[in-house]
């Protein structure tokens, strides 16, 4: 009895959630901290969701419980909701998550624009090069040149790589124009291909009043997609990151490496101990869905040095007092006693977890004489673009590390297992209007305009008269598991040229690829790539890109002898990949 009283006094709200006493919880929440953690690292909302107590979860969400917070194991509330298998729970949590994210986006834009206002005016180009050592992927990796103008509280960002859709890269000419003040902002998305402009004007207080929970109702197919797909959480682990100067020269004569990047001398650093950790949960899937997921696993992952650990469901510890969301019949006294060892027992549906870890090396080119400030001028813009772009979001996570001195004029970071992004800054203050050359080649340091004297022509921020304006269009883009969507798209790109039949099964929450054996896949891929060159078809859906045009022209001119030589080279690449596979298995 004393133990029960102790639990009630130390964790009164958690105990109400445990018992699903949602009516009393409603009364007690008015003066209590809804984000307090229990001894197992769960907030009230996490506890309610893990136990499947929908009524308590709704009460907590009405009281503004943080729906984005992670528990002690690094899972979000939405992850745990999907794990319950309850469509109502997923619907409720997803609706509040989207409402929260939209609110945060609206609140954050004016603050970022204020930071931009305080920074000196400038123009810069960011060249994005997506690269891969896997031949099938490297052929379809796109490039993009991002042009940025900043003048006062005005900002314009031009891009051509829009993202992923239907397993292909989407291209187009887009400009994002931001204008703002202390309490207002104007956002414009300019579609130069269709000559259409979507504008959104908002006063922060009025916009927040218009935003309602009813506007964020998820579609039923989105709930179904999550419940029939693995829960996948991909993160970049940089807690043990280390920066080391790259060496050049022969053994005994090695020196610190330096390179000239767009006219600026830069020191080259290797960034070590960067890991991509992918965690996959499948306990909410049916046996048929689990079987299909295992069969559809991408066999190319074995080539990538991925270390995988699988953790099955909890053992046969269930008792007659167990429930679906408390299968090992943990008592409140056991759960809330921080000194009590639960061993492998836990609340919630028994986890079926796979963890994949892959270490990467990133590379930095740091210049101490670069005319831009990373913190004052560049990071606020990356923060702003990260709200609508997955690769900008990954760059933001990386660029906020404690870098060596200087400006990162060139960065190479992993985006996904087989895909790297190389970002190069150049042509600083080399373009004051939108009509000038879009070349990415940087100008020498001595030719760059002084930052204090550089002025951007204000026509850059104006809309051409021939464009159609859709005023007050709602165009808030939510990043819905963007890294997982990117992961899925890249894996599908790997297999795009090797498919001989339609895909089957539902779309996944993340990186589920549809394939069979590695040998059969790679053989089909080689055959398809040869047909691609002969027939002028694009394997990765990049018919819009200039690279495809040049490759197509080259393919049309190839003779039969050159095609035979190409097939031989592909066979040699296959042998090299097989050798990498054997080495990776041996190292493990």
Swiss-Prot record:
ANK repeat ranges per the UniProt record: 40-69, 73-102
PTM annotation (Phosphoserine): residues: 205, 584
GO CC aspect terms: cytoplasm; late endosome; perinuclear region of cytoplasm; plasma membrane
Pfam families, sorted: Ank_2, ANKRD13_C
GO biological process: negative regulation of protein localization to endosome; negative regulation of receptor internalization
InterPro entries (UniProt xref): ANKRD13, ANKRD13_C, Ankyrin_rpt, Ankyrin_rpt-contain_sf, UIM_dom
Domain UIM: 481-500, 517-536, 547-566, 572-588
Keyword Transmembrane helix recorded: no
Reported modifications of this chain: Monoubiquitinated, inhibits interaction with ubiquitinated EGFR.
Top-rank taxon, per record: Eukaryota
Protein keywords: ANK repeat, Cell membrane, Endosome, Membrane, Phosphoprotein, Repeat, Ubl conjugation
General function of this protein: Ubiquitin-binding protein that specifically recognizes and binds 'Lys-63'-linked ubiquitin. Does not bind 'Lys-48'-linked ubiquitin. Positively regulates the internalization of ligand-activated EGFR by binding to the Ub moiety of ubiquitinated EGFR at the cell membrane.
Protein name: Ankyrin repeat domain-containing protein 13A
Underlying gene: Ankrd13a
